[in-house]
């Protein structure tokens, strides 16, 4: 049985201070075989690589637009530096010249925590409390899908049968609970210092909860959480968000990030303050801040 995972499944942003080439650098994807194709939404041209699009040659106020679908995110993790925080930090540091336009965060359940049949029934029976005005349940040959929020909403929750959509007969269970955020909601999400898993559930808990209706209490917001939903929420303290790739793949990503993404800043720092000052500050940081778990794992595997 596969482990449950949480992942970024759509990343889209614009920049008025970048060219298409500097966006490639930002992603760590300068050396991959991009294809030049027709742009969209007012952009005349677009660089395309494995579901990653960089649109350019629009009007001056449009800047450039980078869009990574779910498959594009996987390509970024495989062929680029894979450091989403590097992208998000850049957007946070340049709020007047960049915009986070869309961000999807998905929880993939392979272990049966998300009971889609119960979720669909409770939705139809209005056994939930929500900040959304609209909801929808769809049944099709691609499986069951439950929506909270409209397609134009700044935030939307979609729970659906990924196993049926992908026709994965080799899996017993694959249900995805996806939070789609746009514009200000997406920007607020990336500004949080919480780990990704805690951020995800903090947003989900704020917008949606399935309940056990109490006929003796007319205030449904006080109702207990439905058992099937509580089982899903209880995973917040136990699930690791890091999926362990191969060591050499990690070394490549580490080098790609340090040299391609942060190389200019490091080089400037050394020229201004010297290599000894840089090493001193890094040693001080090591004593004050715990290393990211993926870097700790890399050090352990390299001996």
What is the predicted function of each stretch?
Residues 1-249, 257-303:
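Structured, helix-rich domain cores that form ligand/interaction pockets
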């Amino acid at each position: 049985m596969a482990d449950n995972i949480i992942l970024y499944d759509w990343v889209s942003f614009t920049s008025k201070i970048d060219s298409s080439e500097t966006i490639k650098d930002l992603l760590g994807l300068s050396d991959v075989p991009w294809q030049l194709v027709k742009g969209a939404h007012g952009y005349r041209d677009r660089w395309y690589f494995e579901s990653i699009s960089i649109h350019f040659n629009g009007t001056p106020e449009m800047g450039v637009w980078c869009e990574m679908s779910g498959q594009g995110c996987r390509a970024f993790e495989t062929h680029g530096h894979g450091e989403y925080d590097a992208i998000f930090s850049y957007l946070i540091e340049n709020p007047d010249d960049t915009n986070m336009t869309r961000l999807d965060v998905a929880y993939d359940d392979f272990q049966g925590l998300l009971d889609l049949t119960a979720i669909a029934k409770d939705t139809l029976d209005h056994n939930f409390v929500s900040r959304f005005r609209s909801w929808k349940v769809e049944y099709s040959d691609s499986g069951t899908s439950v929506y909270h929020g409209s397609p134009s909403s700044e935030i939307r929750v979609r729970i659906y049968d990924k196993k049926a959509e992908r026709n994965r007969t080799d899996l017993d269970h694959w249900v995805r609970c996806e939070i789609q955020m746009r514009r200000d909601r997406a920007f607020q999400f990336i500004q949080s210092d919480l780990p990704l898993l805690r951020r995800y559930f903090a947003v989900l808990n704020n917008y949606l909860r399935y309940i056990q209706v109490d006929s003796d209490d007319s205030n449904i917001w006080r109702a207990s959480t439905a058992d099937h939903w509580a089982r899903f929420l209880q995973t917040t303290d136990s699930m690791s968000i890091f999926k362990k790739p191969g060591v050499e793949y990690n070394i490549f990503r580490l080098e790609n990030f340090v040299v391609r993404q942060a190389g200019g800043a490091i080089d400037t720092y050394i020229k201004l303050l010297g290599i000894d000052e840089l090493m001193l500050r890094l040693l001080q940081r090591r004593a004050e801040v715990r290393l990211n778990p993926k870097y700790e794992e890399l050090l352990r595997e390299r001996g």
